[in-house]
């Protein structure tokens, strides 16, 4: 093997997963041809299809394949067929959560942008959406109020209470901050750290540690913003943001807000990574069982997930940009799938994959 041979565990999953993953394969084929990179790709069952074939949503063989890979390209899991199962045995909880835990995927990256030609889909005011935006939300995934102890309920009657605890350790903040600054170096070199340091002790520590880490990256500018102001600024002027660095709960909120203001949630990729840059890359949307098998699903989120994989886990920045530029070219040319075409002629899932692959080869 050369240093540009990569092993990818491909987990198409359920619903539209296999259809859109087939388009990601086409795009990776084009990247191999153009850049001289080689991807060794093996597909494995995960989610509902794994329950049907192996009796559990994350078979040992699938987990082993992920352990032996440089990265995981994930489709989507779930559907009505498996909703009768106990929650922890359903495709989503039984596959994705164990993968995140097993590989210690503490960082979630969610890009959000308005592509040229799709401004009208944004719910933002026309003059704001016309300016466009290109944001990455860097969210800490394994700490904070979702996992802090103690948590629970106690008492009864008027004195019954429930409680959760926001806990962050210095090392957790340091490692997520470094990923935000490294990401900014590949972009416009701006990090905005989101906190509530006027109220929360955890946010005071967050701000202190992020400011310390910023000194390691003198070429990247750092600003701080309170979460309540950030939610407003995203509506008022999203173009001001480049990389938004967030705790678990704040990132949960802001990544969904960023997705919604694009107006095209079906095109957004997502990455979850650990400290060694091993990552799981997937569309931010679901398995869409209602349109599965109809060759009408939008494959762009899956294709852009492959671009994130190239950038963050494999270090192939030029190849990642080629994919993103090809997607932008296709959309700007009005080559759209049914979810975006409206009354205009729509491309099928497979035709969209072909178009994007051809733009890569002809650029």
From Swiss-Prot:
GO terms for biological process: L-leucine biosynthetic process. Its main location: cytoplasm. SMART domains: Iso_dh. It catalyses: (2R,3S)-3-isopropylmalate + NAD(+) = 4-methyl-2-oxopentanoate + CO2 + NADH. Pathway: Amino-acid biosynthesis; L-leucine biosynthesis; L-leucine from 3-methyl-2-oxobutanoate: step 3/4. It is an enzyme of class 1 (oxidoreductase). The record marks 146, 196 as: Important for catalysis. SUPFAM superfamilies: Isocitrate/Isopropylmalate dehydrogenase-like. Catalyzes the oxidation of 3-carboxy-2-hydroxy-4-methylpentanoate (3-isopropylmalate) to 3-carboxy-4-methyl-2-oxopentanoate. The product decarboxylates to 4-methyl-2 oxopentanoate. This is 3-isopropylmalate dehydrogenase.
């Amino acid at each position: 093997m050369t240093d540009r041979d990569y092993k990818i565990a491909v987990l198409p999953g359920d619903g539209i997963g296999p259809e859109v993953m087939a388009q990601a394969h086409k795009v990776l084929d084009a990247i191999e041809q153009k850049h001289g990179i080689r991807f060794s790709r093996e597909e494995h069952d995960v989610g509902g299809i794994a329950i049907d074939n192996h009796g559990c949503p994350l078979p040992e063989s699938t987990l082993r394949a992920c352990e032996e890979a440089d990265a995981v390209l994930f489709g989507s899991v779930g559907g009505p067929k498996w909703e009768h199962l106990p929650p922890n045995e359903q495709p989503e909880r039984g596959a994705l959560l164990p993968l995140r835990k097993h590989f210690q995927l503490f960082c979630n990256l969610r890009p959000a942008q308005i592509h040229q030609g799709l401004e009208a889909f944004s719910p933002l005011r026309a003059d704001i959406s016309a300016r466009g935006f290109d944001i990455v939300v860097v969210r800490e995934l394994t700490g904070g109020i979702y996992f802090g102890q103690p948590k629970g309920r106690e008492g009864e009657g008027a004195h019954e209470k429930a409680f959760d605890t926001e806990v962050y350790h210095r090392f957790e903040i340091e490692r997520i901050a470094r990923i935000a600054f490294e990401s900014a170096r590949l972009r416009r070199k701006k990090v905005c750290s989101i906190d509530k340091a006027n109220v929360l002790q955890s946010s005071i520590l967050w701000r202190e540690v992020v400011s310390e880490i910023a000194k390691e990256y003198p070429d990247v500018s750092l600003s701080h913003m309170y979460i309540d102001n950030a939610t407003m600024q995203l509506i008022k002027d999203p173009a001001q943001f480049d990389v938004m660095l967030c705790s678990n709960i704040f990132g949960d909120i802001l990544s969904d807000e960023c997705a919604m203001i694009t107006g095209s949630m079906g095109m957004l990729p997502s990455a979850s990574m650990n400290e060694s840059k091993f990552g799981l890359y997937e569309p931010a949307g679901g398995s869409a069982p209602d349109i599965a098998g109809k060759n009408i699903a939008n494959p762009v989120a899956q294709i852009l997930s492959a671009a994130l994989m190239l950038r963050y886990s494999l270090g192939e920045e030029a190849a990642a940009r080629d994919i993103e530029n090809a997607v932008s070219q296709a959309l700007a040319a009005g080559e759209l799938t049914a979810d975006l075409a409206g009354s205009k002629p729509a491309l099928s899932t497979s035709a969209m994959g072909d178009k994007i692959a051809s733009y890569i080869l002809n650029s």
